[in-house]
């Protein structure tokens, strides 16, 4: 019984650090607006985001002096503004913390801006991992 106490204490003290990993089907529903945008299929998106963030909406990654946020790993160097990087260009005009929730509306709008400016290869996982053989990424209900 004693080893359970520290685990319980950690889950009470740090409830906000729990990851929210979406399934392919959940993500397909949330990303409807992106399907076919700039000729990128939903299966390409699911594959790319799986290899970018593990489909985790709350993930942050520190990367060469900037931080990347959420399922799309949106950087505070250019796309959003954070406390750590208040000098960001903030092209998406959004606080980075907004990309760490399960409401993907603002994430999708920013992803569309990134796509318009840089294309799908902005997400480095796309070209080597998500350019072909995408059947496994389709939502099958």
UniProtKB/Swiss-Prot annotation:
GO biological process, one term: lactose biosynthetic process
Sugar-modified residues: 64
Pfam families documented for this protein: Lys
Cysteine disulfide partners in this protein: 25-139, 47-130, 80-96, 92-110
Entry-linked InterPro entries: Glyco_hydro_22 (IPR001916), Glyco_hydro_22_CS (IPR019799), Lactalbumin (IPR000545), Lysozyme-like_dom_sf (IPR023346)
Tissue-wise expression: Mammary gland specific. Secreted in milk.
Main location: secreted
GO molecular function: calcium ion binding; lactose synthase activity; lysozyme activity
Domain C-type lysozyme: 20-141
UniProt keywords, alphabetically: Calcium, Disulfide bond, Glycoprotein, Lactose biosynthesis, Metal-binding, Milk protein, Secreted, Signal
GO cellular component: extracellular region
Its biological purpose: Regulatory subunit of lactose synthase, changes the substrate specificity of galactosyltransferase in the mammary gland making glucose a good acceptor substrate for this enzyme. This enables LS to synthesize lactose, the major carbohydrate component of milk. In other tissues, galactosyltransferase transfers galactose onto the N-acetylglucosamine of the oligosaccharide chains in glycoproteins.
Family: Belongs to the glycosyl hydrolase 22 family.
Protein name as catalogued: Alpha-lactalbumin
Organism: Oryctolagus cuniculus
Taxonomic path: Eukaryota, Metazoa, Chordata, Craniata, Vertebrata
Gene label: LALBA
